[in-house]
Swiss-Prot record:
Species annotation: Orientia tsutsugamushi (strain Boryong) (Rickettsia tsutsugamushi)
Function: This protein binds specifically to 23S rRNA; its binding is stimulated by other ribosomal proteins, e.g. L4, L17, and L20. It is important during the early stages of 50S assembly. It makes multiple contacts with different domains of the 23S rRNA in the assembled 50S subunit and ribosome.
Protein name as annotated: Large ribosomal subunit protein uL22
Organism domain of life: Bacteria
UniProt record similarity statement: Belongs to the universal ribosomal protein uL22 family.
PROSITE patterns from the UniProt entry: RIBOSOMAL_L22
Coiled-coil zones: none
Keyword set, alphabetical order: Ribonucleoprotein, Ribosomal protein, RNA-binding, rRNA-binding
Gene Ontology CC: one annotated term: cytosolic large ribosomal subunit
Lineage: Bacteria, Pseudomonadati, Pseudomonadota, Alphaproteobacteria, Rickettsiales
GO terms of molecular function: rRNA binding; structural constituent of ribosome
CDD domains referenced in this protein's UniProt entry, alphabetically: Ribosomal_L22
BP GO terms, sorted: translation
One of the Pfam families matching this protein, by short name: Ribosomal_L22
Amino acid sequence: MFEAKKSAKATLRMIKISPRKLNLITGLIRNLKVSDAIMQLKFSKKRAAVDVKKCLQSAIANAENNDGLDIDNLVVLEAIVGKGSVMKRLVPRARGKAFRIKKFFSNLYITVSEIK
């Protein structure tokens, strides 16, 4: 969609939210200008929006400080959600039994790039 010149990346690992829920938020910001993406995340009521916003701001800072890119021309090129590790816990039940519950973690990879 956009012709990218240079890009900067940021990753956030071991986020305590399932990848399925996190992917709902990242779908909102893909292919948006960075300023529009931050506004989307700022007014979102989802809990995952805070973590995505933190990772996006890290990618913006990497683009500005490491690569010298102009913030006004940055676009969210990729927002990829990966499956992290799964923490397994036991919940005591009746008659001495125990049920296993899974707590999912996610990894988030955001790439921003400067457009022409």
